[in-house]
């Protein structure tokens, strides 16, 4: 018994020694990791590095970020201030928030900073995208893509988008079970982007399959840059290659077409614009640009659409005000005819519905959309790389370090609004409101970024949200299918953790046309 007890003590002692040594080694490794990045500062500058933690060797604070979500950034902002350092996704990062700090970053494009997304995003999206371009290539690609979102193109998109949204809302009302809104919104935005924006000919089964594949790609866009079996990057590459296989034929056909591109056909507009600038785009370039356009529309628009539906449900007074505005504009009653299979409005003889000009007159609807994007911006921020060492808020930003400006933190801490920033108040964007105006005011509200890299498709995105608000309010009422409102996850895209389960019910209507009533 004594020898057995001594053996147990010996084992426990050895285990304790091992754990102590392991702890000391881990602590030493962390200190050396921190020292490594401290020594990477620009010694020509007398300014200190921002406060913060670099986490653990190689992983940095990536795991904390993924687990804690928005709390990761808010807790560090409270501890270190509006400029702090961390280490995410394999790179040292300086996180920046606050209108003046963000203004410096956004207006410093090509001078202080250049666009920098995580390495995994560059690998998955390719080298021919607007996202990855810098300098003159960026300006040229932006000029080409600008035609896709021109006024004439948007005019062509609006009636087709409205038809698709009307069909979707009616399908939700017809469902005899709860609708998972976030999943439905992702499927809807992919269909609209693929069929309406890119003009791809997809049946429902193929569209559903590609939407799932695309979701796999985007879900692994922000992953560790390790191309090994079962890694997120490997899954993303496999999904991307499957998308490219489908796009090969569609892109090749577009390249062979000789007619002038009409507004509303994104791929043909891109091809013709590039040719006018003396460049013949390759199949690979067009595939990458097509995937980038899908990426720009997919999760972000689905996220904002879900947030719109959730916030309207939580604030019924806003629904009442929208209904009053629609009635005042003669738009209070929706056409009850069945839209065409393509998503375009029905050929029913009803009075023409919404246009860009009509949307422009819906001031309160516009305020609601802006407030949704302020309170729950789909994307938390944007990445840049410092081209040279510069000062920001009393700290040095060393050349070569990544900078991430925070949209969400900037919105949450903006002190320019009359009403509290954490509340839902569309009136803050009203005509009579002076909120967010004055010196630097536009950088208190940045859901679409700003400067040379502001979102080209912001008018299209806002039009989609306005159309969705109109179709919802005059077609349906909705209620929770769960006991309580869901928790919102904010990394990497804002969305409800349970997908937002809702029941939709059609509003009473009178026949408005020759087609079948809903």
Curated annotation (Swiss-Prot):
Disruption phenotype: The knockout presents no discernible embryological defects, however double homozygous mutants for Cyp26a1/c1 display a more severe RA embryopathy phenotype than either mutant alone, with lethality by E11.0. Among others, this includes CNS patterning abnormalities, a reduced size of the head, eye, frontonasal region and an open neural tube between the fore and hindbrain.
GO biological process, one term: retinoic acid catabolic process
Ranges annotated as spanning the membrane: 293-313
Gene3D superfamilies in UniProt: Cytochrome P450
Organism superkingdom: Eukaryota
Listed Pfam families: p450
UniProt-recorded Gene Ontology molecular function terms: heme binding; iron ion binding; retinoic acid 4-hydroxylase activity; retinoic acid binding
Coiled-coil intervals, chain numbering: none
E.C. code: 1.14.14.1
Annotated membrane topology: Single-pass membrane protein
Places the protein is found: Membrane
Cofactor(s) needed: heme
InterPro entries per record: Cyt_P450, Cyt_P450_CS, Cyt_P450_E_grp-I, Cyt_P450_sf
Family, as annotated: Belongs to the cytochrome P450 family.
Function: A cytochrome P450 monooxygenase involved in the metabolism of retinoates (RAs), the active metabolites of vitamin A, and critical signaling molecules in animals. RAs exist as at least four different isomers: all-trans-RA (atRA), 9-cis-RA, 13-cis-RA, and 9,13-dicis-RA, where atRA is considered to be the biologically active isomer, although 9-cis-RA and 13-cis-RA also have activity.
The protein, known as: Cytochrome P450 26C1
Annotated source species: Mus musculus (Mouse)
Higher taxonomy: Eukaryota, Metazoa, Chordata, Craniata, Vertebrata
Name of the gene: Cyp26c1
